[in-house]
Curated annotation (Swiss-Prot):
It comes from Sulfolobus islandicus filamentous virus (isolate Iceland/Hveragerdi). The chain crosses the membrane at residues 23-43, 93-110. It is a multi-pass membrane protein. Keywords: Host membrane, Membrane, Transmembrane, Transmembrane helix. GO terms for cellular component: host cell membrane; membrane. This is Putative transmembrane protein 49. Its main location: host cell. The keyword Nucleotide-binding does not apply.
Length: 140
């Protein structure tokens, strides 16, 4: 019995105590590693939060710049549309008067042609007197 007791004590001191010490050491190392990991994780979370906040701030700043450009471009396009409408309006008026002038010129040319067929000498006198008047008005 003493021998069996000695065997158990030797086995306990040779094998079990070192294993228990290793388990305790590994538990302590695990706690320390967990603390370091948690600390490093906290630092990582803090850095991630800072970077995320900076990213959001930059995105808001960029968004405000884009909105400002959008507003300026919208105002420029609105002004361009208004100018285009004004040009279109006056272009229509100008085209109307040009067509009216061409109709009037056609009537006078037709009238002149028919008068020239009737009395060429009188028509040529009219053309000559008009040329003299125009020449005197252009080059006084």
């Amino acid at each position: 019995m003493v021998r069996a007791l000695l065997f158990h004590v030797i086995t306990y001191t040779k094998f079990i105590v070192p294993v228990v010490k290793l388990l305790i050491m590994s538990a302590i190392a695990g706690v320390i590693a967990g603390a370091f990991g948690g600390g490093i994780g906290g630092v990582g979370d803090a850095i991630g939060t800072i970077i995320g906040d900076l990213e959001r701030a930059i995105a808001r700043f960029g968004g405000s710049i884009v909105n400002a450009f959008k507003t300026v471009i919208d105002k420029i396009l609105t002004l361009a549309v208004r100018i285009g409408r004004i040009i279109e309006k006056y272009f229509r008026i100008a085209v109307h008067y040009i067509v009216l002038f061409l109709r009037l010129a056609y009537r006078y040319m037709y009238s002149f042609y028919t008068e020239f067929q009737k009395d060429p000498w009188r028509s040529l006198q009219f053309v000559g007197s008009m040329a003299i008047l125009l020449n005197n008005s252009l080059f006084p």
